[in-house]
C-alpha cells in the first residue's frame, strides 16, 4: 500500500502562514495524492490554539473537500498533534470513564465519530474518502511507524515555550521524563497542558505570548537565522535602533542565567543554545529518546512537529539514525521528518528553497524500501509562498475568531 504522509498543516493559523488554505498551493499535493492508496495527515492539521475552532474549520473545509475528492474512496488517516489534540480529547475522556481499559498502545485506531464531533465533521467533508483516526500514531508497515512527534518536547534541551510547559507539568506531577517507558507516561504530562492551551483559545483569540510570536521574537533577539541584521534594518531611526540593540543585549546576557535557573528549578535539562544546528540536533536527540523509551528501536520513525524536513542531502545521516539506547544493544530508530506546510518566515532566510524548513514536505512509504522524503513546493519562490501573495478572496478569508 503506497502511503503519503504530510504533517503540520496548521490550517486556520491567525498569521495565514498555512499554505494549504490556498487553492494554487494545494495542487501539487493533490497531484501526488493521485498515485497513492492512503494519505496520512500526521498531526497539527488544524490550528486550534489561535482562536475558536470555528475559524480553523472554515479554513480547513475546502482542503478536506478537495482531498476527499482526490482520494475518491481511498483511505485518509488523521493523527492528532499538540496544536489539535482537542480532536481526540473527547475519546480520551470517555476512555477514562471505563472500568476496565487497556493501557494506551502505540496505535489506537478509531472511527471519526468515536474521536470527536470535530473529526466527524472533517470526515464528512472528506467524503468519499474513508477516514479513520490513529493516536498517537500508526504502523504504516511492520517496520515503519508514524506519529506527530509532540512527545519529544519532554526531552528537548531547547527552552521553547512548549518544552517549559511540559517540564513544569512533569515537575508538578512528580513524573520526570527520565522515567518514561510508555505512551501513557507521555500522555499523562502532555495532555493536561494541551487541554489548558485549547481552553484558552476556545472563546477568544490567543495573544502573542501563547501563539508562538513571543518565542519567535526572543529567537530573533538571540541571533537566530541572521535576524540581528534584519532587525537592525527594520529599525527606522537611530533611537529605535539603539533601543532594539539594548533589548537584544539584555536578552542575550540574561538568557544563560534564565536557563540555569530553570535547570536548578528542575524544569530541565536545558541548554542555552538556540542555533539552527542545535534546533536540529536537539529535536533528533529528543525524538530518538522517545522512540527508544516506547520500544521503536530499529524501525523507521516518520514524524513532524519540528517543521524541519530531513534527512536532506547535506545532513549527516548519523544524526538521523539514532544510536542504541544501551551500548551494544539493539540499534536505534531511523528518523525521517516530513517537514511542514507553513510559511515560517523566520527560518526561510537565504536563497529560495534552500532552507530545510522550506514548506511542502511529504514522505512516501511504499511496500518495501526506505521511506522517501519528497518536497513538493521546491519550484515555488518565497514571494509566491508568502501570505502576502494570496489571491484576493483567500487574503480576505478571516482567521480564527
Named regions from a protein language model:
Residues 1-401:
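Extended recognition/assembly regions associated with phosphoester-bond processing machinery
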Amino acid at each position: 500500500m503506497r502511503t503519503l504522509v504530510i504533517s503540520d498543516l496548521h490550517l486556520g493559523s491567525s498569521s495565514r502562514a498555512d499554505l494549504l488554505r490556498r487553492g494554487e498551493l494545494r495542487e501539487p499535493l493533490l497531484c501526488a495524492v493521485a498515485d497513492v492508496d492512503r494519505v496520512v495527515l500526521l498531526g497539527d492539521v488544524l490550528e486550534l490554539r489561535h482562536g475558536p475552532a470555528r475559524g480553523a474549520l472554515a479554513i480547513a473545509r475546502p482542503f478536506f473537500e478537495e482531498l476527499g475528492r482526490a482520494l475518491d474512496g481511498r483511505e485518509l488517516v488523521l493523527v492528532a498533534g499538540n496544536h489539535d489534540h482537542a480532536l481526540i480529547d473527547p475519546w480520551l475522556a470517555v476512555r477514562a470513564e471505563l472500568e476496565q481499559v487497556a493501557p494506551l498502545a502505540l496505535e489506537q485506531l478509531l472511527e471519526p465519530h468515536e474521536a470527536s464531533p470535530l473529526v466527524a465533521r472533517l470526515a464528512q467533508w472528506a467524503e468519499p474518502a474513508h477516514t479513520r483516526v490513529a493516536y498517537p500514531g500508526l504502523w504504516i508497515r511492520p517496520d515503519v511507524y508514524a506519529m506527530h512527534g509532540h512527545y519529544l518536547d519532554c526531552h528537548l534541551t531547547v527552552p521553547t515555550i512548549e518544552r517549559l510547559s511540559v517540564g513544569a507539568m512533569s515537575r508538578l506531577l512528580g513524573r520526570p521524563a527520565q522515567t518514561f517507558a510508555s505512551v501513557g507516561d507521555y500522555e499523562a504530562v502532555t495532555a493536561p497542558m494541551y487541554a489548558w492551551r485549547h481552553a484558552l483559545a476556545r472563546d477568544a483569540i490567543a495573544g502573542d505570548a501563547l501563539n508562538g510570536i513571543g518565542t519567535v521574537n526572543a529567537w530573533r533577539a538571540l541571533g537566530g537565522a541572521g535576524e540581528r541584521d534584519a532587525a537592525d534594518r527594520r529599525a527606522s531611526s537611530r533611537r529605535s535602533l539603539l533601543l532594539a540593540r539594548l533589548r537584544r543585549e539584555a536578552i542575550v546576557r540574561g538568557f544563560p542565567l534564565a536557563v540555569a535557573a530553570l535547570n536548578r528549578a528542575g524544569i530541565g535539562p536545558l541548554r542555552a543554545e538556540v542555533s539552527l544546528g542545535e534546533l536540529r540536533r536537539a529535536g533528533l536527540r529528543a525524538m530518538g529518546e522517545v522512540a527508544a523509551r516506547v520500544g521503536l528501536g530499529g524501525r523507521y520513525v516518520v514524524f513532524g512537529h519540528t517543521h524541519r524536513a530531513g534527512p536532506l542531502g547535506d545532513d549527516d545521516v548519523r544524526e538521523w539514525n539514532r544510536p542504541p539506547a544501551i551500548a551494544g544493544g539493539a540499534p536505534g530508530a531511523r528518523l525521517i521528518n516530513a517537514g511542514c506546510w507553513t510559511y515560517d518566515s523566520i527560518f526561510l532566510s537565504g536563497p529560495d528553497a534552500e532552507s530545510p524548513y522550506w514548506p511542502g514536505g511529504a514522505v512516501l512509504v511504499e511496500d518495501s524500501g526506505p521511506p522517501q522524503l519528497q518536497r513538493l513546493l521546491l519550484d515555488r519562490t518565497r514571494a509566491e509562498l508568502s501570505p502576502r501573495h494570496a489571491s484576493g478572496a483567500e487574503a480576505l478569508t478571516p482567521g480564527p475568531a
